[in-house]
Design a protein with these regions (language model features):
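Solvent-exposed interaction surfaces and binding hotspots enriched for charged
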Residues: 1-101
Length: 101
């Protein structure tokens, strides 16, 4: 994998991470309220670890599957699904957090 391709893939993973983090932040604010700073901080810290792992997993798989001859098509496809992947990551984490007790 070329450095250029690695940089492009990193940019996609960062987009996914940012979108998923925003969705989780909104979910926590709505579900738990903004006044529970300690709980919020801990849950967000946990989420960041999970999101980071998901982004790393995505990167690892994408690097393993990359075919240099169709890189541009693959990158375009991945970019098309960024929102979908972020939503999937976020909804899995929301299930982990569970409803407000």
């Amino acid at each position: 994998m070329t450095k250029k391709h690695q940089a492009e893939l990193t940019a996609v993973a960062e987009k996914i991470y940012d979108l998923a983090a925003n969705e989780i932040q909104a979910y926590i604010n709505k579900t738990y309220g903004k006044n529970q700073e300690n709980t919020l901080a801990q849950q967000l810290e946990d989420f960041h670890v999970i999101a980071d792992t998901a982004a790393s997993y995505l990167m690892g798989n994408a690097m393993a599957m990359v075919d240099e001859s169709c890189w541009n098509d693959d990158l375009k496809t991945l970019n098309t699904h960024v929102r979908q992947i972020a939503t999937y990551v976020a909804s899995n984490q929301q299930a982990e957090l569970g409803p407000k007790s």
